[in-house]
Amino acid sequence: MSALTSQLEEFRRCSTAEQYFDLLDVDYDPRVVAVNRLHILRFFAEEIAGLHDGADAEVSPEVLLRDYRAALIRAYEAFTTATALDHRLFKVLKDRAPEPAGFVPMSEITVERPATTQTDEKGQQR
């Protein structure tokens, strides 16, 4: 068994974020992972699910591990530049998403002024 195949098998046995980071040799700040662990793992899972159209068995271990590493980096960086609320990966956060404020362009705004009354020379309203 090659070292890459062995590493791929080890990847499949990983169960913590730190194990993925260590195995794929991705630097990380433990504080970022501690706060965003589930969100990073969810983002990572979604990223790898979209790789190779589900045909991982047909892809070499070297390519798989390279692509998994890139996906983990994307997942991690997503939470170093934004928050879990920004990404809303979990249903509980999606359900609490604020409704976007309605936008009314200036061209649609009209002003109606009350009719003014005018008087003639005799003081009567017209």
Curated annotation (Swiss-Prot):
Entry superkingdom: Bacteria
One of the GO biological process terms: nitrogen fixation
Disordered: annotated segments: 104-126
HAMAP family, alphabetized: NifW
Family recorded in the similarity comment: Belongs to the NifW family.
Record function comment: May protect the nitrogenase Fe-Mo protein from oxidative damage.
Descriptive protein name: Nitrogenase-stabilizing/protective protein NifW
Organism name: Parafrankia sp. (strain EAN1pec)
